[in-house]
């Protein structure tokens, strides 16, 4: 289980550096050169990762992950996180900054190889996220109109 503990530590440091401190300068310490991203909205590789999150960080300068739980088993690591931020920066998904606060949960799953993140999958509550940004109508708004 020592490998699982080490893998868990790598993921925790990665999440803190990237999603709390917005530091993309150390990605070589966390991501393999052939890193595979399974989120269809995020381009492949390190450069795609940086591009994707640069847009989010510019739109929500206070974007942060709160790590709720991390579980490791062999080469797999799962993190349950709450994402929080405020759309006060640049345009995002066609929406001008409106000061909308966002808060939603996500689960990130990482496959580790040789101490680095080789693959990533995620499941995020994008309906809540997009509703809070005003991109889609939230369930509460629909019920009020009916």
State where each predicted segment sits:
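C-terminal and inter-domain tail/linker signature
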Residues: 1-146
């Amino acid at each position: 289980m020592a490998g699982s503990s080490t893998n868990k530590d790598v993921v925790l440091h990665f999440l803190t550096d990237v999603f709390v401190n917005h530091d993309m300068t150390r990605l070589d310490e966390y991501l393999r050169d052939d890193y595979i991203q399974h989120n269809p909205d995020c381009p492949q590789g390190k450069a795609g990762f940086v591009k994707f999150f640069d847009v989010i960080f510019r739109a929500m300068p206070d974007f942060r992950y709160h790590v709720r739980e991390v579980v490791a088993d062999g080469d797999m690591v799962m993190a349950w996180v709450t994402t929080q931020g405020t759309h006060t920066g640049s345009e995002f998904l066609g929406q001008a900054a409106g000061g909308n606060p966002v808060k939603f949960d996500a689960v990130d799953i990482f496959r580790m190889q040789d101490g680095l993140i080789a693959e990533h999958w995620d499941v995020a509550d994008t309906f809540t996220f997009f509703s809070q940004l005003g991109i889609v109508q939230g369930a509460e708004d629909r019920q009020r109109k009916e």
